[in-house]
Regions:
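Generic secondary-structure microfeatures
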Residues: 22, 33, 43, 66, ...
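Low-complexity, flexible helical/coil segments
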Residues: 3-12, 28, 62-70, 124-135
Length: 170
């Protein structure tokens, strides 16, 4: 890292401890997106109510001890602990965090998780969603949530971003 700009203390507290705890994680995506943030207030895991949501079945943790802006690395340690060996953490009253062996994969899971949070919020507003069976959720997750599928699914979004911002990679 070069330069003399300010460091985002909260980002450092979370990401530095996550990477220390999980050497297999090369990238982590976290933001305060509207649907992830809204879903996080429910204090529960995403249900396997659709094919896309099955990607996160038994692959998410939840951090329930939100205490405001993360300023201490100790809280980053607790977030990493809540994530465990999973790919996604729901940070209650805060948002979502996804991980991966590459930026592409972490971002694809973030984008997909955001849409799945939106879908579950809509489904719950309409009634009582019906989850798929445990067996179906696992089979579907194994098919759609592997690194190759995630990487390939992200490429059209990456191409669109580069087309919209051609100097991005300069």
């Amino acid at each position: 890292v070069q330069g003399d700009r300010d460091v985002n203390v909260a980002a450092f507290a979370i990401h530095s401890r996550l990477h220390a705890a999980r050497p297999d994680v090369n990238a982590a995506a976290h933001s305060h997106s509207i649907y992830g943030r809204t879903f996080s207030t429910l204090g529960k895991l995403l249900d396997p109510i659709s094919q896309d949501a099955c990607a996160f079945y038994e692959n998410q943790g939840i951090y329930k001890d939100f205490s405001g802006v993360v300023e201490e690395v100790d809280e980053g340690d607790e977030i990493a602990k809540a994530l465990g060996d999973k790919q996604v953490a729901i940070l209650q009253n805060h948002g979502i965090l996804t991980t991966g062996p590459s930026v592409d994969i972490a971002l694809w899971f973030y984008m997909s998780m955001e849409r799945c949070c939106q879908a579950q919020l809509m489904a719950e507003a309409a009634g009582e969603p019906i989850s798929v069976s445990h067996e179906t959720a696992i089979k579907t997750r194994e098919f759609i949530a592997n690194d190759i599928a995630a990487w390939a699914s992200y490429q059209p979004a990456f191409d669109k971003i580069v087309k919209m911002q051609p100097d991005l990679l300069d």
